[in-house]
């Protein structure tokens, strides 16, 4: 089927043809035949790079041309940004695109001017909770990566969000995009959707297992030169020599960095100098935007054509790595499986060095087939690679046979809803009541009876959990159940002021309850300055930053840091020294409770160092985390501190101003005195303190700065960017030279250095 045959505007057809899309792939043609452009619901369960995004675009374009609005739901912020950039290419045709991934307690009514809105599932759920005005104008919903219904963390929110959208507008078109899963037909039936199920790919995928000196594919072999001890390094070198790129999936962050260091010394020997000079530019940008030892290690690897990628890196470094790989400068990325979760970074060859993952309950366990297929599916760049290869590594023949049977030749597992637990349901029961989707127990049962969980399981199982959630919400004064004035046999459910606020703040009701109880333990106040209060048990509490930081760290919404053996003494000594700052300390004899409390305190200690401007390098060393982890914990605690401030206001206690102040400090990782400076683009906590200490305490002071003084302080390029960012016109002729750094020069010299053996 040719794209010019489709019932979409001619100018958009021209846009696609100009970009090389003239004929639809077979799964795309099948979707059109099944009614994609006729507002029919559709589930496309097809491999990576088989044209799922085009299906979404066509459905959204058709909806917009008919006066509708489209919502594109993604699981990850990074994927939202990627799709937003792609859809912005439709702007010349009058299609406005917006993105929303941020504040989870805002209505974002301004987004309503757009034709396509890109949002994460959590943000979409938040918009529904906050009564966003344009939500009922949505006529087409695209759900990307719908197989994540199977995820314990993200699945329940995605499932309830889809259910709400279909309830809000029964005529909405749902276009669901999925990996190939075992029960795609069941998912399609739940959605009332036609199913496109296909294994077709534009680039052939060869899945195999390396055993000995050959990759063994079903029915064929490929010999690999064993130049190095590490088989994965040999695969990498083989790929680069054939002008391809590699993704290497590891089981841990440490292994990612370790393999990158090992491989980089070998890869550098076969790269052109021109490429290495360009790599040097990326490496120097990594060094200039990082404060940690990890940044130095990453930069050194990048100089040699290899990078590592995981959640412990800061977002700037992850983007630099991704862009360097897309530009075919970085030849190898060693990554944790997070890279396979949605980002569009295909490669000629995918190497899966470890097929086991650590489980805290069961130790090292084999990964699911679906996870393997997601990683393998990254192999083969459409229109660039003649084929793609995914390779598992086996040490013995038995392991080789097992990997072939259990992964290469296996089908992906069925998807199962994770909604049926009190932890998963609690927040959604509250929001369903607060937002008016249900006002009685029966209406609540009916609403959740339309979920995927109810479609797969017996409804009575769900009703039992819903009743448990209701008892909790009623006990915590977040929901009331009252008799109907006219009919005493009818009981109506209502969200209280507390319940409504908790729902809008997008926190777990258990988190809301813990924060409220914490404030009650600290004590109530009618006003005045902060100081010592007496809690309900008669103990003096001195309210400090740590008091509030620990309060939010004690909630289930906050990810706790693990306790290492070396942490117990340090954290316990801190607790003893600061015992008057905690609203509650468990009895040490209750070992499980006390150990959990210590984990909360350790997490709060990290945040305390963050807001008091301890360097990121020192924090990573003190707490054994990555720079990306610091920012992730800061993001979560900022959101929870905002919630605590709002709840303090509702309760009438005096700590809301302290909480709001901490919220700002957590956002920037600095003291309040730097707030004006850290608001300048490109000025973080470190540069802001350097500027402040040099007398540049405000934007006004910076506007009068001598450019030479500023350049000596932060470097010419940064000085230029700062002044430009605050509206100062600067002659940029002095900022264009970019000399090669000593590290880059050393790398080039090492690469070209001759040894005695070269002359034998």
From Swiss-Prot:
Record has Nucleotidyltransferase as a keyword: no
Keyword Oxidoreductase on this protein?
no
An individual GO BP term: DNA repair
Protein EC:
5.6.2.4
What taxonomic lineage is listed for the species of origin?
A: Archaea, Methanobacteriati, Methanobacteriota, Stenosarchaea group, Methanomicrobia
Q: How does it assemble?
A: Monomer.
Protein name, as recorded: ATP-dependent DNA helicase Hel308
The record places domain Helicase C-terminal at 232-426
Report the sequence similarity comment from the record: Belongs to the helicase family. Hel308 subfamily.
Where does motif DEAH box map?
A: 144-147
Recite the UniProt keywords alphabetically. Answer: ATP-binding, DNA damage, DNA repair, DNA-binding, Helicase, Hydrolase, Isomerase, Nucleotide-binding
* Enzyme class name: isomerase
Give the GO molecular function terms. Answer: 3'-5' DNA helicase activity; ATP binding; ATP hydrolysis activity; DNA binding
The protein's matches in PANTHER family, at most eight in alphabetical order, are given as: ATP-DEPENDENT DNA HELICASE HEL308, DNA POLYMERASE THETA, PUTATIVE (AFU_ORTHOLOGUE AFUA_1G05260)-RELATED
């Amino acid at each position: 089927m040719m794209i010019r045959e489709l019932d979409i505007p001619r100018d958009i057809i021209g846009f696609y043809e100009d970009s090389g899309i003239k004929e639809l792939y077979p799964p795309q043609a099948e979707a059109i035949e099944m009614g994609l452009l006729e507002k029919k619901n559709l589930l496309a369960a097809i491999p990576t790079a088989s044209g799922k995004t085009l299906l979404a675009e066509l459905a959204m374009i058709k909806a917009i041309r008919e006066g509708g609005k489209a919502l594109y739901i993604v699981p990850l912020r990074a994927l939202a940004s990627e799709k937003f950039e792609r859809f912005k290419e439709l702007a010349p045709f009058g299609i406005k695109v917006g993105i929303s991934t941020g504040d989870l307690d805002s209505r974002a009514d301004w987004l309503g001017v757009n034709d396509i809105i890109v949002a994460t599932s959590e943000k979409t759920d938040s918009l529904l909770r906050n009564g966003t005005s344009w939500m009922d104008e949505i006529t087409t919903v695209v759900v990307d990566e719908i197989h994540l219904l199977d995820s314990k963390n993200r699945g329940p929110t995605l499932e309830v969000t889809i259910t709400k959208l279909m309830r809000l507008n029964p005529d909405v078109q749902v276009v669901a995009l999925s990996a190939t899963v075992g029960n795609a037909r069941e998912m399609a039936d739940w959605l009332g959707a036609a199913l496109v199920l296909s294994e077709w790919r534009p680039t052939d995928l060869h899945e195999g297992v390396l055993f000995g000196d050959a990759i063994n594919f079903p029915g064929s072999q490929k010999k690999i030169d064993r130049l190095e001890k590490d088989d994965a390094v040999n695969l990498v070198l083989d790929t680069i020599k054939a002008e391809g790129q590699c993704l290497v999936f590891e089981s841990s962050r440490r292994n990612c960095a370790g393999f990158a260091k090992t491989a980089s010394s070998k890869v550098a020997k076969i790269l052109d100098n021109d490429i290495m000079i360009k790599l040097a530019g990326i490496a120097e940008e990594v060094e200039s935007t990082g404060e940690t030892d990890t940044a130095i290690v990453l930069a050194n690897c990048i100089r040699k054509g290899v990078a590592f990628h995981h959640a412990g890196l800061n977002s700037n470094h992850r983007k630099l790595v991704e862009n360097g790989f897309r530009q075919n400068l970085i030849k190898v990325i060693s990554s944790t499986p997070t890279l396979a979760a949605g980002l569009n970074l295909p490669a000629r060859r995918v190497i899966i060095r470890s097929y086991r993952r650590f489980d805290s309950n069961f130790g090292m366990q084999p990964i699911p087939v679906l996870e393997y297929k997601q990683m393998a599916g990254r192999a083969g760049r459409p229109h660039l690679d003649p084929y793609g290869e995914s390779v598992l590594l086996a040490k013995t023949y038995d392991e080789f046979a097992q990997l072939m049977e259990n992964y290469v030749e296996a089908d992906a597992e069925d998807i199962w809803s994770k909604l049926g637990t009190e932890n998963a349901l609690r927040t959604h029961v509250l929001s369903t009541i607060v937002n008016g989707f249900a006002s009685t127990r029966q209406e609540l049962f009916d609403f959740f009876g339309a979920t995927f969980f109810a479609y797969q399981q017996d409804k009575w199982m769900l009703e039992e959990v819903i009743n448990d959630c209701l008892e909790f919400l009623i006990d915590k004064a977040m929901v009331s159940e009252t008799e109907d004035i006219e009919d005493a046999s009818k009981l109506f459910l209502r969200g209280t002021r507390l319940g409504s606020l908790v729902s809008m703040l997008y926190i777990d009701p258990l988190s809301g309850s813990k924060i409220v109880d914490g404030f009650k333990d600290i004590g109530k106040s009618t006003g005045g300055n902060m100081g010592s209060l007496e809690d309900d048990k008669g103990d003096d509490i001195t309210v400090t930053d740590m008091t509030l930081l620990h309060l939010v760290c004690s909630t289930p919404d906050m990810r706790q840091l693990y306790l290492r053996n070396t942490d117990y003494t340090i954290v316990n000594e801190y607790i003893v020294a600061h015992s008057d700052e905690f609203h509650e300390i468990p009895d040490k004899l209750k070992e499980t409770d006390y150990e959990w409390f210590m984990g909360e305190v350790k997490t709060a200690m990290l945040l305390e160092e963050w807001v008091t401007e301890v360097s990121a390098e020192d924090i990573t060393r003190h707490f054994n985390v990555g720079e990306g982890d610091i920012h992730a914990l800061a993001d979560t605690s900022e959101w929870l501190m905002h919630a605590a401030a709002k709840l303090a206001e509702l309760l009438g206690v005096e700590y809301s101003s302290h909480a709001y102040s901490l919220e700002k400090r957590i956002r920037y990782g600095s003291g309040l005195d730097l707030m004006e400076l850290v608001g300048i683009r490109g000025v973080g906590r470190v540069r802001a303190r350097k500027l402040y200490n040099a007398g540049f305490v405000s934007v006004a002071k910076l506007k009068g700065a001598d450019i030479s003084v500023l350049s000596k302080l932060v470097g010419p390029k940064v000085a230029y960017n700062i002044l430009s960012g605050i509206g100062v016109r600067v002659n940029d002729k002095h900022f264009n030279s970019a000399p090669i750094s000593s590290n880059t020069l050393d790398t080039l010299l090492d690469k070209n250095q001759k040894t005695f053996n070269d002359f034998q």
